[in-house]
Amino acid sequence: MSDLLSGSLSHDKVTRFLNGKNLSSKDLWEFIKPEIRKHEENSGGVLILDDSIEEKPYTNENEIMCWHYSHAKGTHVKGVNIISCLIRYGDITFPVGYEVVHKDILFCDIETKKVKRKASITKNEHFRNMIEQSKKNKIPFEYVLADNWFGAKDNLEYINSLEKKFIIGVKSNRTVALSKNDKLRGKFQKVSTLDMKDGQSIKAWLKGIEFPVTLIKKIFTNEDGSTGTLYIVSNDLTSGADHLYTIYQKRWQIEVYHKSIKQNSSLAKSPTKCVKSQSNHIFSSIIAFCKLEILQINTALNHFALKYKLIVRANQIAMAELQNFREGVA
């Protein structure tokens, strides 16, 4: 890299950067704020939140590089757990906040007698804090979208208290009442036991929550041909099931983000070993994603196409240089 940039960037300069200022979500916002203001829309914006684990099985353990439960794998894995908050307007998506889960409390597990870690700030607390910060930053959004791992009672109540709409997944064992009278009498049943057709929506009351929600059931087909059932809830009682599900599908853009920061922004290639440098590397990967997104807007090429185009062009130049060497020898 130093040779490529004629010495303007050195290994020592990168090392000093990674071990310098503690870079955070606040710095991300300062960087991306001008782009958000350029593309923001007063209606139709969706705030998307989700977490992802970058596995690092061979890196020394610390408060961010530790064991986390992976709901994708159904087991605990060693790595970094990052919660991200994205804003989406049409086809444009930018991260506006992120938090790295810090398991900064050591405790002894009574059953196993082993020392374990837990976080002083939970993922659900980070979830609510990032929504609050987005509102403070005056980011226009109409809906909050998340999967069922963030469908906790406190999260739904918090979003509703902000007078914002949510469309969030709930687990199949969540219990609901089908009328206000049933709610008052304590007559609740699991959503999985409800006689609902694919795409159907009903008005329901989640246990422990005062306000009613629209409950939607969707049946989907997996890549292996098996089928699954998705339940989502919304405090938007005026929109139909098809409209709400169409909006909810915008949530999948965060999966593209997770894939891109891992494969195109070198999130997984951090050689750092201490918390500060590891955290600053994560920040740098997210900034790189933002720059790729800006290029995508300007070129109409997605991140993977941009990367492929650069690799092809670099190889063409290398092949031409190789040919020059051969002709020189001849």
Regions flagged by a language model, labelled:
Residues 43, 60, 92-94, 98-330:
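Single, function-defining residue in the core of a domain
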Residues 15-16, 67, 148, 265:
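Flexible, active-site-adjacent loop/turn segments at secondary-structure boundaries
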